[in-house]
Amino acid sequence: MLSDIWDGSFVLLAWTLLLWVLGFLFIFASLVGMPPALLVAVFAIAPAVTGMMIMVSDSARGKFMRLGSALRGMRRFYWRSVALTLPLALLLWLILISAGVVSKNPGHSELTIALALQVGVGLTMAILHIYALPLLALLDTSVKQTALLAVLLAGKFIWQTLALLLVCIALLALATLYLLVWLIVPGVWCVIVVNATWRMARQVAPGLAGIDKS
């Protein structure tokens, strides 16, 4: 895994610079309001992250990482990556609206319960998204297949899922403390999660992974 990061360091860094540009666009959009920021996240950042994961998926199969693969994959998987991330973005927006309603109406337990349920569903969807884009990049599955496989992996590999979640949180915390760490966080995360997802997918869906177990 470390060799994947080292061998592909140039292309990972180059694609990370694109993600930086989109990240600044997200920040500027958030100054306007949450809806524009979420639109940037869904229609720009998610496809770009998928493109990086497609590069890394080539490496997981023993091929070289190439920027061309990311560009072609980003176009090919664009609408599927949007379809996978849009529900989570809409739910996040709903949670923020509900949180505002609860803060303005204290003492209404039914509103608090509804918000708690929304947060629970949102956290569950966020955990499933650990696998969603990597599965899409690795297996070229439909949106429905990708979602079902994400549920299957999260349910079958509970401890590995928790470990990936902790790694994600740790990388985000580190990047928050040191801004320049953002230069390596996207690449490191993609290498870790794509390789982990590839190993799991080969066990639960060998046919989709191109493995003949007959």
Predicted feature residues:
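Generic alpha-helical transmembrane segments
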Residues: 121-128
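Helix-coil boundary and N-terminal low-complexity module in membrane systems
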Residues: 1-104, 110-113, 128-214
